[in-house]
Protein backbone atom coordinates (compact mmCIF):
# COMPACT_ATOMS: atom_id res chain seq x y z
CA UNK A 1 0.00 0.00 0.00
CA UNK A 2 1.25 3.48 -0.83
CA UNK A 3 0.03 6.95 0.14
CA UNK A 4 0.64 9.87 -2.22
CA UNK A 5 -0.89 13.35 -2.27
CA UNK A 6 -3.87 12.36 -0.12
CA UNK A 7 -4.64 9.11 -1.94
CA UNK A 8 -4.08 5.49 -0.89
CA UNK A 9 -2.93 3.00 -3.54
CA UNK A 10 -2.99 -0.78 -3.11
CA UNK A 11 -1.04 -2.67 -5.79
CA UNK A 12 -1.18 -6.44 -6.24
CA UNK A 13 -1.44 -9.26 -8.75
CA UNK A 14 -4.05 -11.80 -9.78
CA UNK A 15 -2.35 -15.21 -9.96
CA UNK A 16 -5.30 -16.65 -11.91
CA UNK A 17 -5.00 -14.19 -14.80
CA UNK A 18 -1.32 -13.18 -14.31
CA UNK A 19 -2.41 -9.54 -14.31
CA UNK A 20 -0.96 -6.81 -12.14
CA UNK A 21 -3.27 -4.05 -11.03
CA UNK A 22 -3.86 -1.34 -8.46
CA UNK A 23 -6.85 0.28 -6.82
CA UNK A 24 -7.05 3.61 -5.01
CA UNK A 25 -9.17 5.59 -2.58
CA UNK A 26 -9.15 9.00 -0.94
CA UNK A 27 -10.86 7.47 2.13
CA UNK A 28 -9.24 4.27 3.33
CA UNK A 29 -12.50 3.35 5.10
CA UNK A 30 -14.62 4.13 2.04
CA UNK A 31 -15.07 2.79 -1.46
CA UNK A 32 -12.09 1.81 -3.62
CA UNK A 33 -11.72 2.37 -7.36
CA UNK A 34 -12.18 -0.30 -9.99
CA UNK A 35 -8.93 -2.20 -10.70
CA UNK A 36 -6.50 -0.47 -13.07
CA UNK A 37 -4.31 -3.03 -14.86
CA UNK A 38 -0.68 -2.55 -15.84
CA UNK A 39 0.78 -4.47 -18.78
CA UNK A 40 3.77 -5.84 -16.91
CA UNK A 41 4.03 -9.36 -15.54
CA UNK A 42 5.57 -10.63 -12.35
CA UNK A 43 4.32 -10.87 -8.80
CA UNK A 44 4.47 -8.70 -5.68
CA UNK A 45 4.37 -5.39 -7.58
CA UNK A 46 5.03 -1.99 -6.05
CA UNK A 47 4.70 1.69 -6.93
CA UNK A 48 7.22 4.49 -6.56
CA UNK A 49 5.99 8.09 -6.73
CA UNK A 50 9.03 10.23 -7.49
CA UNK A 51 9.38 13.83 -8.65
CA UNK A 52 6.21 13.86 -10.75
CA UNK A 53 6.75 10.36 -12.16
CA UNK A 54 5.21 7.02 -11.17
CA UNK A 55 7.16 3.78 -11.55
CA UNK A 56 5.64 0.31 -11.52
CA UNK A 57 8.07 -2.30 -10.19
CA UNK A 58 7.73 -6.10 -10.11
CA UNK A 59 9.79 -9.22 -10.47
CA UNK A 60 10.30 -10.82 -13.87
CA UNK A 61 13.06 -11.90 -16.22
CA UNK A 62 15.57 -10.08 -18.38
CA UNK A 63 16.08 -10.82 -22.09
CA UNK A 64 18.19 -13.88 -21.18
CA UNK A 65 15.62 -15.40 -18.82
CA UNK A 66 17.47 -14.36 -15.65
CA UNK A 67 15.27 -13.40 -12.70
CA UNK A 68 15.30 -9.63 -12.34
CA UNK A 69 13.49 -6.66 -10.91
CA UNK A 70 11.52 -5.11 -13.80
CA UNK A 71 10.40 -1.48 -13.92
CA UNK A 72 8.41 0.83 -16.18
CA UNK A 73 7.00 4.32 -15.85
CA UNK A 74 3.19 4.50 -15.90
CA UNK A 75 0.37 7.02 -16.12
CA UNK A 76 -1.21 6.63 -12.65
CA UNK A 77 -4.66 7.62 -13.95
CA UNK A 78 -4.83 4.90 -16.62
CA UNK A 79 -2.12 2.34 -15.81
CA UNK A 80 -0.73 2.76 -19.35
CA UNK A 81 3.01 2.35 -19.73
CA UNK A 82 4.97 5.50 -20.53
CA UNK A 83 8.21 3.53 -20.98
CA UNK A 84 9.12 -0.03 -21.88
CA UNK A 85 9.58 -2.50 -19.02
CA UNK A 86 13.28 -2.68 -18.21
CA UNK A 87 15.26 -5.06 -15.96
CA UNK A 88 17.09 -2.96 -13.37
CA UNK A 89 18.66 -5.48 -10.93
CA UNK A 90 19.18 -9.24 -10.73
CA UNK A 91 19.18 -9.41 -6.96
CA UNK A 92 21.90 -10.31 -4.48
CA UNK A 93 22.15 -13.94 -5.58
CA UNK A 94 19.35 -15.58 -3.60
CA UNK A 95 16.75 -17.71 -5.34
CA UNK A 96 13.15 -16.58 -5.90
CA UNK A 97 13.76 -12.85 -6.32
CA UNK A 98 10.47 -11.09 -5.52
CA UNK A 99 8.68 -8.28 -3.69
CA UNK A 100 10.72 -5.29 -4.94
CA UNK A 101 10.12 -1.91 -3.32
CA UNK A 102 12.03 1.25 -4.23
CA UNK A 103 12.57 4.35 -2.09
CA UNK A 104 14.14 7.70 -2.99
CA UNK A 105 15.88 8.89 0.17
CA UNK A 106 18.06 11.97 -0.14
CA UNK A 107 19.88 11.63 -3.46
CA UNK A 108 19.86 7.81 -3.46
CA UNK A 109 17.42 5.20 -4.74
CA UNK A 110 17.21 2.11 -2.54
CA UNK A 111 15.80 -1.12 -3.95
CA UNK A 112 14.64 -3.59 -1.27
CA UNK A 113 13.75 -7.16 -2.33
CA UNK A 114 12.88 -10.56 -0.92
CA UNK A 115 14.94 -13.59 -1.88
CA UNK A 116 15.18 -17.22 -0.83
CA UNK A 117 11.49 -18.17 -1.04
CA UNK A 118 8.92 -17.64 1.70
CA UNK A 119 10.07 -20.53 3.86
CA UNK A 120 13.24 -21.03 5.93
CA UNK A 121 15.61 -19.40 3.41
CA UNK A 122 13.64 -16.14 3.20
CA UNK A 123 15.65 -12.92 3.44
CA UNK A 124 15.68 -9.20 2.72
CA UNK A 125 18.40 -7.79 0.44
CA UNK A 126 18.98 -4.35 -0.97
CA UNK A 127 20.92 -2.30 -3.49
CA UNK A 128 21.26 1.38 -4.28
CA UNK A 129 21.73 3.74 -7.20
CA UNK A 130 21.95 7.44 -7.98
CA UNK A 131 19.39 6.94 -10.79
CA UNK A 132 15.92 5.38 -10.72
CA UNK A 133 16.91 3.25 -13.76
CA UNK A 134 20.23 2.09 -12.26
CA UNK A 135 22.75 0.71 -12.40
CA UNK A 136 22.12 -0.65 -8.90
CA UNK A 137 25.03 -1.46 -6.60
CA UNK A 138 24.59 -4.59 -4.50
CA UNK A 139 25.03 -4.05 -0.75
CA UNK A 140 28.10 -6.22 0.06
CA UNK A 141 26.65 -7.51 3.35
CA UNK A 142 23.35 -8.83 1.96
CA UNK A 143 21.11 -10.20 3.22
CA UNK A 144 20.32 -7.36 5.61
CA UNK A 145 17.64 -9.32 7.45
CA UNK A 146 17.13 -13.09 7.73
CA UNK A 147 16.89 -15.97 10.15
CA UNK A 148 17.99 -18.57 7.60
CA UNK A 149 20.28 -21.18 9.11
CA UNK A 150 19.20 -20.09 12.60
CA UNK A 151 16.97 -23.01 13.58
CA UNK A 152 16.60 -22.07 17.27
CA UNK A 153 15.09 -18.66 16.49
CA UNK A 154 11.37 -18.54 17.30
CA UNK A 155 10.43 -16.49 14.22
CA UNK A 156 11.46 -17.96 10.84
CA UNK A 157 10.98 -17.09 7.16
CA UNK A 158 11.67 -13.38 7.63
CA UNK A 159 11.39 -11.46 4.35
CA UNK A 160 9.25 -9.29 2.07
CA UNK A 161 10.47 -6.13 3.78
CA UNK A 162 8.77 -2.79 3.27
CA UNK A 163 10.14 0.42 4.79
CA UNK A 164 7.98 2.85 6.74
CA UNK A 165 9.02 6.36 7.76
CA UNK A 166 7.59 7.87 10.93
CA UNK A 167 6.70 11.54 11.27
CA UNK A 168 9.93 12.12 13.23
CA UNK A 169 11.98 10.94 10.21
CA UNK A 170 13.02 7.56 11.64
CA UNK A 171 12.73 4.46 9.45
CA UNK A 172 11.38 1.00 10.26
CA UNK A 173 11.00 -2.20 8.30
CA UNK A 174 7.91 -4.42 8.27
CA UNK A 175 8.40 -8.02 7.26
CA UNK A 176 6.52 -11.26 7.20
CA UNK A 177 7.62 -14.30 9.13
CA UNK A 178 6.18 -17.40 10.75
CA UNK A 179 6.33 -19.14 14.08
CA UNK A 180 6.37 -22.92 14.35
CA UNK A 181 3.44 -24.44 16.19
CA UNK A 182 4.80 -27.12 18.50
CA UNK A 183 2.33 -29.84 19.44
Language model region names:
Residues 1-183:
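Carbohydrate-active catalytic/glycan-binding domains of CAZyme proteins
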Amino acid sequence: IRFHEGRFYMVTNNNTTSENFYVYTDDIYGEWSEPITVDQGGIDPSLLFDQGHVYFISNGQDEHGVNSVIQCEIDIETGKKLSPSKPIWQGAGGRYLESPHMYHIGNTYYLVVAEGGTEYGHMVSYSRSDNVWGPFENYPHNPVLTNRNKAPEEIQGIGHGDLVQKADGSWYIMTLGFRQIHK
